[in-house]
Amino acid sequence: MLRIYAPASSANISVGFDTLGVAVSPIDGSLLGDVVQIEEIEQGFELESAGYFVRKLPKEPQKNIVYQAYVLFSERLKLRNLKIKPLRLTLEKNMPIGSGLGSSACSIVAALVALNQFYQQPFSKMELLEMMGELEGRISGSIHYDNVAPCYLGGVQLMVQSLGNICQQLPFFDNWYWVLAYPGIEVSTAEARAILPKSYTRQDVISHGRHLGSFVHACHTRQEALAAYMMRDVIAEPYREALLPNFAEVKQAVKDLGVLASGISGSGPTMFAIAPDLAIATKSATYLENNYLQNNEGFVHICKVDNVGARALV
């Protein structure tokens, strides 16, 4: 029996719409992500589900993304003339759906990594990542890797999608604390994409390029202040903030508390705030608990970058 954990991820990081993503893990050691267990059985295929958010999963197994991952993986095995083994997959759904924390990516990554290890790794990392992107595209309507790549590989990933590489890891600031606040409401990726304009002004395009280029440069040259300053979003946040509860007010409040940068995690409704030290992270977390959470399903975690990505649990 094998258990694979895939961590939460925050896509875009404000400055890199559909091109940047970071894997995160709580500093208290709790697992913020999904777990998929795989084991051999006598015949056929079985899919079971458990976990706090299991009630949010589709009632029909065929609509479960883990089932779709199994089907896609099996199709790729057949193309290599490899025998399909009888097995059972169990998804522990610990991530809220439509949270902006890469919930679907967690399930996809955990399932495909479990299957690849179960079959003695017939597929390379890039081949597996390509499958992950295809499955993610079925949910959001377009193939993008800014959740699955960091969830799978860890760290901060920049999507390059050229010269045989889907992504490359950016050097980052491990001393930063990431405060993630999920308000307990759901925003679908499709809904969050539909609210965006079909075109942007020349000035917005120039600003976006300047911010992203400067951010990547700052990461490579270890300029924390410049990197944090450039974490600005002219592509999505001005339009998506309407989907989030009192976002502008909360963003200003955590800035006043001393955070370096804040924004929408993925397509929302989770927001992130980056703190330079634990004291400011703790103050920000307390504020967000009291002012951003909307119900009992909401939560706040103080995290750091997860540089490992998907991994087996002992």
Curated annotation (Swiss-Prot):
InterPro entries: GHMP_kinase_C_dom, GHMP_kinase_C_sf, GHMP_kinase_N_dom, GHMP_knse_ATP-bd_CS, Homoserine_kinase, Ribosomal_Su5_D2-typ_SF, Ribsml_uS5_D2-typ_fold_subgr. The gene is thrB. GO terms for cellular component: cytoplasm. Belongs to the GHMP kinase family. Homoserine kinase subfamily. ATP binds at P96, I97, G98, S99, G100, L101, G102, S103, S104, A105, C106. It comes from Histophilus somni (strain 129Pt). This is Homoserine kinase. Signal peptide: none annotated. The keyword Ubl conjugation does not apply. The lineage of its organism: Bacteria, Pseudomonadati, Pseudomonadota, Gammaproteobacteria, Pasteurellales.
